Curated annotation (Swiss-Prot):
It comes from Chloephaga melanoptera. Disulfide bonds: none annotated. GO terms for cellular component: blood microparticle; haptoglobin-hemoglobin complex; hemoglobin complex. This is Hemoglobin subunit alpha-A. GO terms for molecular function: haptoglobin binding; heme binding; iron ion binding; organic acid binding; oxygen binding; oxygen carrier activity; peroxidase activity. SUPFAM superfamilies: Globin-like. Heme b binds at residue 87. GO terms for biological process: hydrogen peroxide catabolic process. Involved in oxygen transport from the lung to the various peripheral tissues.
Amino acid sequence: VLSAADKANVKGVFSKIGGHADDYGAETLERMFIAYPQTKTYFPHFDLHHGSAQIKAHGKKVAAALVEAVNHIDDITGALSKLSDLHAQKLRVDPVNFKFLGHCFLVVVAIHHPAALTPEVHASLDKFMCAVGAVLTAKYR
């Protein structure tokens, strides 16, 4: 459960990300594909090279989903319901991959905003990414 402080920390980080969200989404995917190569199996039709148009396009979708979750931080479940259906029923992505994505996103934030990622903010952002992952895997049962 995200506390009021967690929600404020997450919103603060996303305000710093601002117009870079799409780029950070793509960078997160690139990192995930390198660090966790098994995640590539869900993207057999993608050009997975650095800077590819497909990674940029999907990174934009990832970023949009995260921004949507932040914008509806009191109802992440409602905000990501359709995306949860898609991942559970059609794409059938292994739930562990959302943890990988969350970790890679934290790394990207740390690289671009090291001063903003205090231990408290890091913990809040990690809790937020876990909450997003939980919502995206809730309909797998």
